[in-house]
Amino acid sequence: MNVMLTLMTNVTLASLLVLIAFWLPQLNIYTDKTSPYECGFDPMGSARLPFSMKFFLVAITFLLFDLEIALLLPLPWASQTNKLTTMLIMALLLISLLAASLAYEWTEKGLEWTE
C-alpha cells in the first residue's frame, strides 16, 4: 500500500508539473521577448545555425592530439620502471606516433581552412 501511495503521488506531481510547464508560458507573451534588440538578432528565428565542417574536423583533430599528449605527460610516473632506456623508448614511440599523425594530417590537407 505504501508503494502504491508513493507511486501515485509521484505520478500526480510529475503530471502536474508537466501541465504547468506547458500552460504557464502561453499566458503571457511579452513583446520585449519577441522583438529583435539593437544588434538585429531575431530571438524567435531558427536555432540551427550553419556550422563549418572544416572547423569541426580541425577541432576533432586538436582533441585527438590533445588526448595523445595527455597520455604522454604522465608516462614517466605511470611506467614505474627503473630502466631509463625502456621509458625513453616508450616516450619516443609515442612522440613518433604523434609526429607521423601530424605529418599525415598535413599531407592530406586536414589542417587547412581553405579548400
Swiss-Prot record:
Compartments, as annotated in UniProt: Mitochondrion inner membrane
Entry superkingdom: Eukaryota
Name of this chain's protein: NADH-ubiquinone oxidoreductase chain 3
Membrane topology, record value: Multi-pass membrane protein
Catalytic activity: a ubiquinone + NADH + 5 H(+)(in) = a ubiquinol + NAD(+) + 4 H(+)(out)
Subunit structure: Core subunit of respiratory chain NADH dehydrogenase (Complex I) which is composed of 45 different subunits. Interacts with TMEM186. Interacts with TMEM242.
Family assignment from sequence similarity: Belongs to the complex I subunit 3 family.
Listed transmembrane segments: 3-23, 55-75, 84-104
PANTHER family on file: NADH-UBIQUINONE OXIDOREDUCTASE CHAIN 3
Protein role: Core subunit of the mitochondrial membrane respiratory chain NADH dehydrogenase (Complex I) which catalyzes electron transfer from NADH through the respiratory chain, using ubiquinone as an electron acceptor. Essential for the catalytic activity of complex I.
GO BP terms in the entry: mitochondrial electron transport, NADH to ubiquinone
